[in-house]
Structure formats: structure tokens, C-alpha cells
Amino acid sequence: MPHSRGRLVEVTIDGSTLTLKTLVSVARSNNAVRIDKKALQRTIRGRAVLEKLLRDDKVIYGVNTGFGALSNFKVASGELKQLQANLLRSHAASVGKPHTSDVIRAMMLLRANTLIKGNSGIRPEIPQLIVALLNKRVHPFIPQKGSVGASGDLSPLSHMALVLMGEGKAEYRERWVSGKQALRLVGRDPIQLEAKEGLALNNGTQQMTSIGSLNLSDSYALFAASEAALALSLEAIRGWIDPFDERIHRLRRHPGQARVARDIRALVEGSKLCRTIIKDDPADGRPQDPYSFRCAPQVLGPVIDAMDNVKSTLEIEMNSATDNPLIFPNEGDCLSGGNFHGQPISMALDMMGLGLSTLANISERRISALLDASLNNGLTAFLVGRESKPGLASGLMAVQYTATALVAENKILAHPASSDSIPTSGNFEDFVSMGPGAAHKSTSILENCQYVVAIELLTAAQAVHLRGDAGLGRGTRNVYRAIRREVRPLAEDRSSHDDIERIFELVRKGQFNDIVKQLVKGSN
């Protein structure tokens, strides 16, 4: 729960109430974090139970045994600390470029949040140190690739945990420092790991959940931009507004479908460009629009419904105990299970990728319609500028090539990672989630979609320019103005690269999300 302290916004974590919005605020706005006192007491109770079980000489997986296929080897009591340090060192084996700071901050936040549930058997100093580093903006070096998503994100989280031991390295103010230097920045000494603490640190789903959560947040902004693009395109071709009538969507009762229709009605309210059966003759021109316009609520509705389902899954995961074994303080038990398994996240992120790919697919179809003189209702072929001659000038012909290339790439990336298990650890871990793969490809799919929607916005704005913008609706007028502040109309052929990049930045930063939100709020 966020608290204001002067200009600083401080977020309290308790292991149970973290939300997507709060995670994004910590990851990207650097909001400070504090741990709820009751949550710290839970960690103390959980640690006490583990220590009692060890005094009773109980055999506990990963605490006094080896790991994975080596779990049949018993470890002597005098070697339990070394076992945990060895685990983190040996499993810090990821490769590639380091994660961006927002992903790392999200990972740190999520790991601290799950540890304070009291089911991991760690001392409170561990999550407290993670939060201290987070608040100081000291970000451990975590390479992107190396996790199969079961047993959790072992390798990336091991890289994060090395810094707590004074090992590895971290980024601070855009320079790399050693693990020991990182700890000095927060006035701490290296942690000497006790029994189970290494396993508690690296056994969880925080990498895939962090990447997926940040991508989902950006996907909501993308979705609003796609609605803005659809509305502007609808006006640009002088399309029919009747398919968005509330009565049609009330008969099917899918919430996303109704939401999209509502948003488009709000965006084009007052439009003199859209046609309606009330005032226009269907015999005058085309009586129906192509599916990419007419069926947009039925196509985009399932996308936003899927995103909402993904959000629910991710927020459950944010507040879950995801390591193994788990301590149950009230019963005094320690049980081995599989909460580290990333299948719920993997399948959710595959679904998100599929939904986003669909969003881009239908956007590309509208781009094609806007450029096609047989479909764009009287505009020039490829929206050649007024001062140019079709044939001599190509207009926006080539932007569809780019959109098509991006959509084709997404069709490859939309293949589900969750269906591609490869056994690991001597076939002991014989079914893994590949959740990190689903997360990574969702990043690529998202960026491709942002570009495709940016291209549709560019194309629709040019079409509106050629037709005349005086009749735009209440919301689309603001969409058009936002584009025109960045990109001038196409009068004669020029490179469209810079234009696309400028609109891409508007999409990425949520400019159209703000327009749609304010509009719908005002309509309600």
C-alpha cells in the first residue's frame, strides 16, 4: 500500500497485497519500499520452525540434502552454510545482456515480497537487505538468459543473491561496482547464509513474473492506442458506426467486446465523417465495412479479456510463496512441493503474446484498407500527398511492408513456449515451464505491436488529412492533434522512418492511453 512522505512515495509490502500498479511504480518510478512489521514477525516465526526441525535432525530437501538429481546425498550439519553458498555460486550461470533496471527492481521487490510471507524459513535480515539495496537503487547484475522456469528462475535469482553475499556485481548510478562495494553503499556487511537461505533466494518465479508484469502494463497502454487507431481509421474511410451500437454487444455479453464498442463510440462521438443507418443511405456506396473495422469489438474484446486474465494470474503470483520446501509455522511443518513451477505464468504470457499478435494482425489489415484505393472510399492510392502524382510518388506504400514484416515475425513468436518442455537435472526435473522464454518473446511481440499501431496511426492521420479533419469526433480530434504535434502531413514523398519512430514513442509512453481514459471517464 503506498504512503506519501513529502515528495517521496513509499510502498509497504506485506506478502499479500502487492498489485501490478504498485510493482510498476517501484520498478519505473523508483518509489521507496518498506516492509510491514507483522510480515517481519512472520519470517521470524518461520525461521524458528526450520531451526527446530534441524535440531530434531529431520531430513529436509535442499536444507541438509543436495539439490535436484543430487537430492539423495545427505549433507552434514557442519556443511549446511557452505551448501547454500555453493548453490548460489554454481547456479549463477546465466548469459547475455543484463536486464534493464526496471526488470531488476521488479525482481528484487517480488523476491522480498514472497520471502516475508513467512514460509521460506529465512531470517528477516535477508528481505531487509534486498529492500535496502532497492531503495538505494543498487541493482545486481542479472543476465537475461539462463532460466527454464522450473525450479523457478534459479540462475537469474542466483545472480541477484550473489550481491547479498558480497559477490558478483551491481549497477549504481550507471557504473558497475563489486558486490562488496554495493553492500557498502547501504552500510551493510555481506550476509553469511544460514541453512536453506540460498535455496529460498533462488527458487522462485520472479524473473518471468517481473518481465511479464512490466510488459502487461505496457500492453494496456498499447491497447488504448490500438483503439485510438481504430477510431481514427474508421473516420478516415468514412466507415459505419452502427456495428459499435451498444444493443449489438449487449446480446453477446463478453465484457471486452462491450468495452471496445463503448470506447470507439466515445472516441468518434460527434463525428461528421462516420456514417450511420439513421442518416446515411446504405445504397450510397459500400453498405458494410471490412471485418477489420466492423468486427473489431469481437476481435479486440477477447484481447483485453485475456490481458485482464493475465493480470489476475500475475497478481496472484506476486503474492505467492514460490520456493521449495515451504515452512508452515502454525503447524510446525516443512513440506516439499512445486510452487516454484512457472507453468501458470508461462501459459498466461503465451496467451498475452497471442492476444497482442491478434491486435497487430487486425491493425495491419486496416493499414492495408486505408492504402487501397478500392477500399478507402475515395482517397488516393497509398495516400499519395495532394502535391504529388500517383505513380511518380509512392506515398505510404512502404509502411505496409514494415507492418507486414512485423506481423509475420509475431506469428512466429506467438508459438507457445509453454508447450516446449525440455527435461533438466538428469531427468529429475523432467517437465519445465519455459516461462522465461514466454516472457522474453512477449517483450519482442509487444514492441512489434507498438510499431504496427504507430504505423496505423500515421496512415490514418494521413488519410484524415486528405479527407479533411473538420468532421472528426470528440476523441479522435485529440488523437489527430497528438499525432500532428509530432509529424507533419505527407505532401510529397519522404522517408517515413522518423515519423514512425515519433508516433511509436507516443504509443510507448501511453499518450493515447491518457486520451482514451479521460474520454471514457467523461462519458461515464
Model-predicted segments: where are they?
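Glycine-rich, flexible loop motifs
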Residues: G6-D57, Q84-P143, L216, L234
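Well-ordered mid-protein domain cores that form the structural environment of catalytic cofactors
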Residues: K117-N135, H139, A150-L154, E174-A195
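C-terminal auxiliary extensions adjacent to catalytic cores
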Residues: G6-N31, I35-R42, G46-L54, L80, ...
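Cysteine-centered functional microenvironments
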Residues: I142-S147, N330-C334
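Polyanion/phosphate-binding surface patch
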Residues: K58, F73, V260
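FAD-binding core of FAD-dependent oxidoreductases
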Residues: Y61-V75, E79-L83, S90-N113, P143-M165, ...
